[in-house]
Amino acid sequence: MANIKQQIKRNKTNEKRRLKNVSFKSSVKTAIKKLNKAIENKNKSEALLLLNLSYKKLDKGISKKVYSKNFVSRHKSNLSKLVNNIN
């Protein structure tokens, strides 16, 4: 436990931020899981809509500083490859 007043405040804000980040990351993972399910079912129209939603959430993660630019770029690339391979 921290003894310094400022460190106690920082610990509180860090915990609040951590909880927001965990919640946000969970919503991104859910969107990607839905996209993967649409890809498995070979439903291209639904997959394109979900791809757009996933892109939106990943880009929002960059602006919120939850994800790095390279992480998002890699995931977007991999997801688009999967969607483009649907026949």
UniProtKB/Swiss-Prot annotation:
GO BP terms in the entry: translation
Listed InterPro entries: Ribosomal_bS20, Ribosomal_bS20_sf
Cellular component, GO annotation: cytosol; small ribosomal subunit
SUPFAM superfamilies: Ribosomal protein S20
Region of interest (Disordered), ranges: 1-21
Biased composition regions of type Basic residues, renumbered to the chain: 7-20
Pfam families from the UniProt entry: Ribosomal_S20p
A GO term for molecular function: small ribosomal subunit rRNA binding
Domain of life: Bacteria
Keyword vocabulary terms for this entry: Ribonucleoprotein, Ribosomal protein, RNA-binding, rRNA-binding
Role according to the record: Binds directly to 16S ribosomal RNA.
Entries under HAMAP family matching the protein: Ribosomal_bS20
Family: Belongs to the bacterial ribosomal protein bS20 family.
Protein name as it appears in the record: Small ribosomal subunit protein bS20
